[in-house]
Amino acid sequence: MHVSHPRTRRSLLLAASAALAVTGALLTSPPAKAADSPAPAEVSPHAAQTIDDIGASGAWWVNDLQHFSPAVRARVARLLFSEGGLELSSYRYNIGGGGTAVTTPARAAEDFLNPDGSYDWSRDEGGRTFLEYAARYGVKDLIGFVNSAPSRWTTNGKSCGGLLKAENEADFAGYIADVTDHFARQGVRLDYISPFNEPDNSFADCGQEGMPVPVDQRDDIVRALGAEQRARHRKTGIIADESSRTTQFNSELPQWISQPGTARYVSRLAHHTYNDPDDGELGKVHETSASVGKKSWATEICCFGKGTTGWNQEYDPTIDNALLMSRIIYKDFASSHDSAFQWWVALASGYGSDPSTRNDEGWNDGLIYYDPDYAADGNQKLYFTKRYYALGQYSKFVRPGSVAHNVTGAPNGVEVSTYDRNGQWVVVVNNHNTTGTALNLHFNSGTPVHASKAVRTSATENWANVAKPSVRHGTLSTTLAARSVTTYVLDRRGHGSTALAGAWQGQQSGKCLTADASGAAISTCTGGADQSWSYDAEGA
């Protein structure tokens, strides 16, 4: 469905929707429930992990969008990066390998290398354009990721199916560092580099760029790039290894990161979830990451459908697929305790037979879609999916620095995640049920006093401001709309940390303060009846 050009920055999401402290809080007890009221779900008082970012990648739709009008390109940037749009806090820029022998040219990015080793920085116009937009909008984490090294350094001379030659690892590291330096001179700082993507896949069919990287070479590449960046006094971090499946991540990561001198160069661990892992497997991701003392990121997923979160060809712009996406985000944050979620491609053209209707010819890989025949028919309309709005439920509210708290006891068919953000609670709720569902949610710390916002995405609503839930005695109570994703923002009492750790502890000062109308006096005392206790929200 075409969305008309928004008139104001503030109304981007609404326009698209129209087209389609002083004292710490003491622990509280939930109020007695009425006979027909469900038992409350419980928010843990213990912090789980701090969220770094939520975002998407610029592969490879930017190659098409460079041929769209400047007005459309600017609008897409606003829809993705601005406060009135998704307000993404990360963006993945594809550092190209040149596309040599790739049979689908649109699925490869130009590299900057000339045959003589010099650089042509005018290449990759589309990629550079949207990377610069992301920087201009202040996206927190800009990530450069590599699918293949330039073909001159691969074993088969292609940008697909060939390994990086061992003798060219330093050359490759120098190339990536040169790209990083160039963008820094342009005022665009790449915060992280991912030197290989899905290294377990050979991409030998050459349908896209890709480079297999054996387990015993991954540490060599990380060390080469890390040493090169350090020699140039760059603070760009390295993320790795972006395995396609969590099973590979769990078994292979410990092998390469344990090699001497490697771990110090790794800022974040990265995995994909194309094996549709269950909670147990996701829990192993957390264990693997914790065992090496690193935070993990979920850096790519797409293309699930037909009622499951497993790989399936389907195009579904409806709330059904949006709920599947939201379930994946929920599990990444709640089960593997990832600190970031990054969707595959922000835009795509593979909507199949009809951009407004579910069909089996397209793919669920984008948030927004455009006409694959734009060059012939001149159609530059944008088509929105419910996934766009569902991602916004997280990206706009679960901002960098938000602290996740696990939730237990949610009703059947309901998934609840909670985040402590700047003196407020953010609650994102997925209701997979086909009927309205009652929810009571009790907070064991940082007691909320009232709800300040409620936004819902459902079958009939894209981005709707809805009635706020009641909040009483630290418990949120509401009825969730059928088949919906809803975010609640709750103001709470006090602004200290909500994490409670360790045992209650106190320290006796040996002094007492006596005050009356004539003044105050400090005296030595031993406590006893004169002693009172207060709770410091910093915990033990």
Residue map of PLM features:
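Active-site cleft segment of glycoside hydrolase catalytic domains centered on the general acid/base Glu
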Residues: 152-259, 278-289
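Aromatic/acidic polysaccharide-binding cleft in carbohydrate-active enzymes
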Residues: 298-390, 405-410
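Glycoside hydrolase catalytic-domain groove-lining segments
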Residues: 120-129, 237-238, 264-310
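N-terminal catalytic cores of secreted or lumenal carbohydrate-active enzymes
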Residues: 37-190, 195, 213-215, 219, ...
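Carbohydrate-binding surface patches
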Residues: 396, 408-450, 483
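Extracellular glycan-recognition/adhesion modules and their associated mucin-like linkers
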Residues: 495-518, 532-540
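Secretory targeting and sorting signals
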Residues: 1-35
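C-terminal beta-strand-rich structural cap/linker in extracellular carbohydrate-active enzymes
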Residues: 469-496
